[in-house]
């Protein structure tokens, strides 16, 4: 850019800036305060804000000043409690204020500044609010009268701002809007106070700091006395009574007093009642005047006056105010006869006894020997009444105007008869209590003599039977641990010789009641009323009056009146309830009857004690209406009548005839009253019942409806209307007894003792009293069983109410019955109580009304019945299981024998042109089974001779061996098998000391027969049992060959025993091994078979005739049918858990369950039958020379038996379903042998015959190579043993008592001489020579392990080719077969020489196991008796098994056989 242009641009910009700056400054203006701060009063410690807002341009800054000094804010000091807000306001976090330091209180201004100037706000003061605690003046209590004003003063505490005042009454704020209430300057003024204004008043001072309450002050509002009833002026006659009433009210209750003419009343002239009524009994002229009633309390006083005027009346004759009345008093008592009179002038009163001249005057001094006195009011009192005092007493009143008199009779009675029955002072009350609580039922009684307290429940005695119920002091009943059954009505009975009194209450026991009885305080109850006074008497009523007693917590609300009359009842009776007044007339009484009365008061807390008894009072009598007779005369004549009662006569148990005579028949007799009462029994009573004989001339009466067996007291009394004469003497009579008409009640049956007890307890209550019909003397108890021999009877005394019956039989149903017995006989029996003592001796009580169905149900529920049914079901189930097992075993035994029949032309009947197979569907052979069960080979731990080689049939029994005893061989086979024996590898070869047993290896059954032409099909034998024995002393050797020597390896602790068997040839079986036909030639030699195994050494003491039963033609199935049948690979056995013994059905040493099936090539060669016959004749000829010797230094342990139904046998579905065949091209794929797996729990013998070539043989012991496997190999580590994980088999126990331990280390085993010979080899070819060479090589197996291993690998492919080439040979001549057999025998002899070398005894230390290979189950289309068919996975083993059926190979043959495993299951690598 040009420098000139740049300079110009700079100048231009500078000018623009100057111009713009001048314009901005022109718009600025100085600050001005927009919002000024306001005065504020704030409490100490509270936050507040002084607002200040200013505007200006530029924006002004704001500062605050207090009292002229700048205020320090958080801008200056971050710790300051003052904050300058962005708006300019000053914010105080808290107001700081103290007595000495007041930094925040003062006058504040806000100053806003900018460059143009400053602005100052108005002053704002900040004051700190205060309120002290102490009131300057607290209100004081005030007492006012209602209607007067009340003033309460208060001065609040000091504070800033000055606190205001309001008032609270009873903690509620007073509304001063009410007209009567005003608050002025701290004064509360209430005009015209009311009673409702009374209460506690509090003065409250408040400001912004808070509130302060003064001390409370009480305002008491009293009421002045007021008159409810004022006295009134009265005018009365002289001698009349006068009353002035004065009723007042007030608060507090005013006191009332009377004055007369401003002076006190004269004493003795007036009475003042409780209601302040003034009463003057007899007014006199001197009583005239003004009477003033004065009522006064603390807030007032009132007066009311009335005037009394007394007028003198004229002279009046005397009159009775209160007349004396008749009285009946017992001897020794005191009696008073009232007599009140009036008249003008006042009459003089005196008393006189009728017939006596003595006069008794009021205020007369009492004579020393006199018991009579007269009160000033005219009442006569006689103390210590005697019988001589009886009679009439006359009260006379005498004046100048005349005289009057009144009579009253005094009757004196016997002391005992006069005494009233006992009085219950406090009786029980109704209660509701909880279960397990305690009940207290009070009953306090008094009387003369002192009564006895007893208790009844529902009318029956119960004390003594239940220890929970006891009577405490003063008769209180206590019941502990209450139960629901304790609910009922309880009656307290107070009894004495004078009678009895009862009181009842209800006790209700519930789950939710009170725990214990409530004890009432006697002070809460009202006091007893005063003694009732008789004010009026009529013929059927008496008027009583009394005074209330001392009130309790609450005054009495009502009264109860009780009465007693000896002629009516023997106990107190309630005659009036809920009486509200103290004056009451009792009505409904009998005429001319003496009564006693007493009164009780009631309030909500209960009943009071009774009042004192009233004086006896007799109701008025009734005069005959028309006769107008003199009562005195009637009473006198009746008193002279003497009635003589004769002895009553019992007519029936309920009727008695009463007769009497009268000495003189008086004029005034209307009839005779026969009186009787019960004196015995539970309900004995003192109440007399009456039967009136209304004909005066009648002298007899019949009492009916009497109780049976009860004693009655009878007397007769004459009567005339209401007048009654003297009673006759009493007579007693007892009605006749009868048997009780009702059974005992509440019969219960309980168990006694422990659960093993056979005793029961029976308890009961007596029959109802009305049905006892006499005195119960005893109770009879029957315990009746279902048979007479189980009956148990008992008899107990009448006082006993329970009994224990023992010796009952469990399971027997008893019926318990109880009956009461009197002298007349046994009464009604109770309802039977069925009981059963169960298995645990439990007593089962069934209701009598149960139906038969319910009773059956109860029996079915018994444990004994259930246990019996369960046991029976178990026995039936076990029987059925045994039968089913036997039947199944029998059917399997019949179905497992694969037998062929020889044709007439010497040929073989076959199924579908297949050699060795029968047509299962042929109707000519219905006994053949539909399917072949699973193969389970016998497992044994002993050695047996060759004479028992044929006993592998399912039902054949092994013949006994010398020294063996009763030991039976293990037989677990469910299918047919082949057998091959390897003798050259056994240590007992050429030895006559032991006998070997052949080992089965294939699936076609070899039948035991005594004749070459005999077909032996034996049923299963029960002695064919499992005897699996394992030895721990052989380095964990898993499986062994069958052993029949009882003592062999039978020791404990790993010790071995040798059993010496007789060297003499066994003669048990007449058939010889030479007679056993060989199977048809296999396609491929079996690995591990040597031709030398068939070399016979008869010179060593073996008798060939005792060997194995010959068969006409051996049934045999060829292998190599991969292209015809396919294996069902969905059925795969689960690999076993290591350390668990594998199934001998598959894993038995030198055995194989691989199915041998014919190949299509064999079916196409009809010459095979001829070859088979020729080979059989040659084989039998050569085998006759063999001698079997068994030596076994280390017999291997016996493996556990397999689970029943293992997959080695054919399933039914397998035999009924055809599966398409699968191509077997991968059979020829090379195998790689992996490195061995060490330290396995079990390494049983291989499925191959020669254990030297198996994983337990010598061939792999040094090189530690892993043996190949097949899905259907008997190798326990690859297929069969792994199945034990599904069904582990428990450890077997030897007969010696030792448990078989599970082997824990790998082991190996030599080939044993009891191995069965394999089938003959097919026609010779390249493969045959090669295999014989391998056989020769096996003699040096221990010194050339590496070379053997490599030989096996080299020969795999060659063996496959050899197998194919052997299948391509359609026909062989007889000479070729014979030459092959001769080579085979020579090789066997060479093998035996090699075995005798010292190194033959060497045994490797460990063994290997290949990983688990998925096996394949046989195709359903298979026809093998073992239940399997050929597949890819079983080709190798099946070919090896075929070689066993043709000839034995040398041990080296195994190493060079190319195919020993299944390529379809995986490759093996080294």
Swiss-Prot record:
The modification Phosphothreonine is found at residue 1157. Residues 1036-1089, 1129-1159, 1190-1371, 1383-1470 are annotated as: Disordered. InterPro entries: FN3_dom, FN3_sf, Ig-like_dom, Ig-like_dom_sf, Ig-like_fold, Ig_I-set, Ig_sub, Ig_sub2. Gene3D superfamilies: Immunoglobulins. Disulfide bonds join 52-110, 154-203, 246-293, 339-395, 443-492. Interacts with SLIT2. Receptor for SLIT2, and probably SLIT1, which are thought to act as molecular guidance cue in cellular migration, including axonal navigation at the ventral midline of the neural tube and projection of axons to different regions during neuronal development. PANTHER family: CTX-RELATED TYPE I TRANSMEMBRANE PROTEIN, DPR-INTERACTING PROTEIN ETA, ISOFORM B-RELATED. Belongs to the immunoglobulin superfamily. ROBO family. This is Roundabout homolog 2. It comes from Mus musculus (Mouse). The lineage of its organism: Eukaryota, Metazoa, Chordata, Craniata, Vertebrata.
């Amino acid at each position: 850019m040009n420098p000139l242009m740049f300079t110009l641009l700079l100048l231009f910009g500078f000018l623009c800036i100057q111009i713009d700056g001048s314009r901005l400054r022109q718009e600025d203006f100085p600050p001005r305060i927009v919002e000024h701060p306001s005065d504020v009063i704030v409490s100490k410690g509270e936050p507040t804000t002084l607002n200040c807002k200013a505007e200006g341009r530029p924006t002004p800054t704001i500062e605050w000043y207090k009292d002229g000094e700048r205020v320090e804010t958080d801008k200056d000091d971050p710790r300051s409690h003052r904050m300058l807000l962005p708006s300019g306001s000053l914010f105080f976090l808290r107001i700081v204020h103290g007595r000495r330091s007041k930094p925040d209180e003062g006058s504040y201004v806000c100053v806003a500044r900018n460059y143009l100037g400053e602005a100052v706000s108005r002053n704002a003061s900040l004051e700190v609010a205060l309120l002290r605690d102490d009131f300057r003046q607290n209100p004081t209590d005030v007492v006012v009268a209602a209607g007067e004003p009340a003033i309460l003063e208060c001065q609040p505490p000091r504070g800033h701002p000055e606190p205001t005042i309001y008032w609270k009454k009873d903690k509620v704020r007073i509304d001063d809007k009410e007209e009567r209430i005003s608050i002025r300057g701290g004064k509360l003024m209430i005009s015209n106070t009311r009673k409702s204004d009374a209460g506690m008043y509090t003065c409250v001072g408040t400001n912004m700091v808070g509130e302060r309450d003064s001390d409370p002050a009480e305002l008491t509002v009293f009421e002045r006395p007021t008159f409810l009833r004022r006295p009134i002026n009265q005018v009365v006659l002289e001698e009349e009574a006068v009353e002035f009433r004065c009723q007042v009210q007030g608060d507090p209750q005013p006191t009332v007093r009377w004055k007369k003419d401003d002076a006190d009343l004269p004493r003795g002239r007036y009475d003042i009642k409780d209601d302040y009524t003034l009463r003057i009994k007899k007014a006199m002229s001197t009583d005239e005047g003004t009477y003033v009633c004065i009522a006064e309390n603390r807030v007032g006083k009132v007066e009311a006056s009335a005037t009394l005027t007394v007028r003198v009346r004229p002279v009046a004759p005397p009159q009775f105010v209160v007349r004396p009345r008749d009285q009946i008093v017992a001897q020794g008592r005191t009696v008073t006869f009232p007599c009140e009179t009036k008249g003008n002038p006042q009459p003089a009163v005196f008393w006189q006894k009728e017939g006596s001249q003595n006069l008794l005057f009021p205020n007369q001094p009492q004579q020393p020997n006199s018991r009579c006195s007269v009160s000033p009011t005219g009442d006569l009192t006689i103390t210590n009444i005697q019988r001589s005092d009886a009679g009439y007493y006359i009260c006379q009143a005498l004046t100048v105007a005349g005289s009057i008199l009144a009579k009253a009779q005094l009757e004196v009675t016997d002391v005992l008869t006069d005494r009233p029955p006992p009085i219950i002072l406090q009786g029980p009350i109704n209660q509701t209590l909880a279960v397990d609580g305690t009940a207290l039922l009070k009953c306090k009684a008094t009387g003369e003599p002192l009564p006895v307290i007893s208790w009844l429940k529902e009318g029956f005695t119960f004390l003594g039977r239940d220890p929970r119920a006891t009577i405490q002091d003063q008769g209180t009943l206590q019941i502990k641990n209450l139960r629901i059954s304790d609910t009922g009505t309880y009656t307290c009975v107070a009894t004495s010789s004078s009678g009895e009194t009862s009181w009842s209450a209800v006790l209700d026991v519930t789950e939710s009641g009170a725990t214990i009885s409530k004890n009432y305080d006697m002070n809460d109850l009202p006091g007893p009323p005063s003694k009732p006074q008789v004010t009026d008497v009529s013929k059927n009523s008496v008027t009583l009056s009394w005074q209330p007693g001392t009130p309790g917590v609450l005054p009495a609300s009502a009264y109860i009146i009780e009465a007693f009359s000896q002629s009516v009842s023997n106990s107190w009776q309630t005659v009036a309830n809920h009486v509200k007044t103290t004056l009451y007339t009792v009505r409904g009484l009998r005429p001319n009857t003496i009564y006693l009365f007493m009164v009780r008061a009631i309030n909500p807390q209960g009943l009071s004690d009774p009042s004192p008894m009233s004086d006896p009072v007799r109701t008025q009598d009734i005069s005959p209406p028309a006769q107008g007779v003199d009562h005195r005369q009637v009473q006198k004549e009746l008193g002279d009548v003497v009635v003589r009662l004769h002895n009553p006569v019992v007519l029936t148990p309920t009727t008695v005839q009463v007769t009497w005579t009268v000495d003189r028949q008086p004029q005034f007799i209307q009839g005779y009253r026969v009186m009787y009462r019960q004196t015995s029994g539970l309900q004995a009573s003192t109440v007399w019942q009456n039967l009136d004989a209304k004909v005066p001339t009648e002298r007899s009466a019949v009492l009916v409806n009497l109780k049976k067996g009860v004693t009655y007291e009878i007397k007769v009394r004459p009567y005339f209307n209401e007048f009654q004469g003297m009673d006759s003497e009493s007579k007693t009579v007892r009605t006749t007894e009868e048997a009780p008409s009702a059974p005992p009640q509440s019969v219960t049956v309980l168990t006694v003792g422990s659960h093993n007890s056979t005793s029961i307890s029976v308890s009961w209550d007596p029959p109802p009293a009305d049905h006892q019909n006499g005195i119960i003397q005893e109770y009879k108890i029957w315990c009746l069983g279902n048979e007479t021999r189980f009956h148990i009877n008992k008899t107990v005394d009448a006082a006993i109410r329970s009994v224990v019956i023992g010796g009952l039989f469990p399971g027997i149903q008893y019926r318990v019955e109880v009956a009461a017995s009197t002298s007349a006989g046994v009464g009604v029996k109770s309802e039977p109580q069925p009981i059963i003592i169960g298995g645990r001796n439990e007593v089962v009580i069934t209701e009598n009304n149960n139906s038969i169905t319910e009773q059956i149900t109860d029996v079915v529920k018994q444990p004994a019945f259930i246990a019996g049914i369960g046991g029976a079901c178990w026995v039936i189930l076990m029987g059925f299981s045994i039968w089913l097992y036997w039947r199944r075993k029998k059917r399997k035994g019949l179905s497992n024998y694969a037998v062929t029949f020889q044709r007439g032309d010497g040929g073989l009947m076959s199924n579908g042109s297949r050699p060795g197979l029968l047509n299962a569907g042929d109707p000519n052979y219905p006994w053949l089974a539909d399917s072949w069960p699973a193969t389970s080979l016998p497992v044994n731990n002993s050695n047996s001779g060759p004479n028992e080689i044929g006993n592998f049939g399912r039902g054949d029994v092994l013949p006994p061996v010398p020294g063996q005893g009763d030991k039976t061989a293990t037989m677990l086979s469910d299918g047919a098998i082949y057998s091959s024996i390897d003798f050259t590898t056994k240590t007992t070869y050429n030895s006559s000391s032991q006998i070997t047993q052949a080992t089965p290896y294939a699936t076609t059954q070899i039948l035991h027969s005594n004749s070459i032409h005999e077909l032996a099909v034996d049923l299963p034998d029960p002695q064919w049992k499992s005897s699996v024995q394992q030895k721990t002393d052989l380095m964990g050797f898993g499986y062994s060959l069958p052993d029949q020597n009882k003592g062999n390896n039978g020791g404990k602790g790993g010790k071995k025993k040798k059993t010496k068997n007789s060297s003499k040839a066994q003669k048990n079986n007449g058939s010889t091994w030479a007679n056993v036909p060989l199977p048809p030639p296999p396609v491929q030699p079996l690995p591990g078979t040597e031709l030398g195994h068939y070399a016979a050494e008869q010179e060593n003491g073996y008798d060939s005739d005792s060997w194995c039963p010959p068969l006409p033609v051996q049934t045999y199935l060829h292998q190599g049918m991969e292209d015809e049948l396919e294996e069902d690979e969905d059925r795969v056995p689960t690999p076993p858990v290591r350390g668990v013994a594998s199934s001998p059905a598959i894993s038995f040493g030198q055995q194989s369950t691989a199915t041998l099936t014919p190949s299509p090539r064999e079916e196409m060669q009809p010459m095979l039958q001829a070859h088979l016959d020729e080979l059989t004749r040659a084989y039998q000829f050569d085998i006759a020379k063999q001698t079997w010797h068994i030596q076994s230094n280390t017999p291997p342990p016996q493996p556990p038996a397999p689970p029943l139904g293992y997959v080695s046998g054919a399933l039914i579905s397998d035999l009924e379903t055809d599966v398409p065949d699968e191509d077997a091209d991968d059979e020829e794929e090379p195998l790689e042998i992996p490195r061995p797996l060490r330290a396995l729990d079990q390494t049983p013998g291989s499925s191959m015959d020669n254990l030297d070539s198996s994983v337990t043989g010598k061939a792999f012991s040094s090189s530690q190579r892993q043996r190949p496997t097949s899905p259907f190999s008997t190798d326990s580590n690859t297929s069969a043993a792994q199945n034990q994980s599904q069904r582990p088999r428990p450890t077997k126990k030897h007969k010696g008592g030792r448990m078989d331990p599970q082997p824990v280390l790998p082991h190996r085993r030599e080939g044993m001489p009891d191995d069965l010979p394999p089938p003959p080899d097919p026609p010779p070819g390249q493969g045959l020579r090669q295999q014989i060479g391998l056989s020769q090589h096996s003699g040096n197996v221990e010194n050339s392990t590496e070379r053997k291993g490599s030989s096996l690998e080299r020969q795999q492919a060659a063996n496959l080719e050899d197998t194919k080439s052997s299948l391509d040979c359609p026909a062989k001549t007889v000479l070729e077969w014979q030459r092959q057999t001769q080579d085979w025998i020579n090789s066997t002899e060479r093998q035996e020489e090699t075995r005798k070398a010292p190194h033959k005894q060497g045994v490797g230390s460990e063994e290997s196991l290949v990983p688990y290979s998925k096996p394949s189950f046989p195709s359903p289309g298979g026809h093998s008796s073992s239940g399997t068919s050929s597949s890819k996975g079983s080709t190798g083993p099946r070919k090896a098994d075929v070689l066993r059926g043709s000839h034995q190979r040398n041990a080296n043959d195994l190493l060079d056989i190319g195919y020993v495993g299944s390529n379809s299951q995986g490759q093996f690598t080294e």
